[in-house]
């Protein structure tokens, strides 16, 4: 099952409240800091019972998922405006859509859904939930989520969160 591997990845994600005026700057900064966070917090090179070539197997494995869409990890460029943010997030495939009260697979870009159905904020929120950049705005919650750190040993379980918040 293509989705099964999601059940065995573990990251240490931090969400914090963010205002509209600072959202893009902090989103761009969070993505820029991803390699540093990974370098300082990676501790999971094992995947599927074998040593992977990555210091963080989760980051390495997820990087291959629809890589051309930049669905995971860092984006190829910073966001320049909220319009640019929405336009960029509308390019990837709308993986899972809601139709007639049911959740169904989809294989078309999200912009195509918008073209056919008009503005649809609820659909956008559902779509952006399945885009896993190292830092991502969570519009439904008014937060920025920074997500590339591996889970830390219990004695240091707050270290990654403190680092991310401090940055």
Task: State the predicted function of each range.
Residues 5-6, 20-167:
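C-terminal accessory/tail domains of diverse enzymes
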Residues 12-17, 146:
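Short cationic amphipathic helices and targeting signals
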Residues 3-13:
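Residues forming anionic-ligand binding surfaces in small-molecule and nucleic-acid pockets
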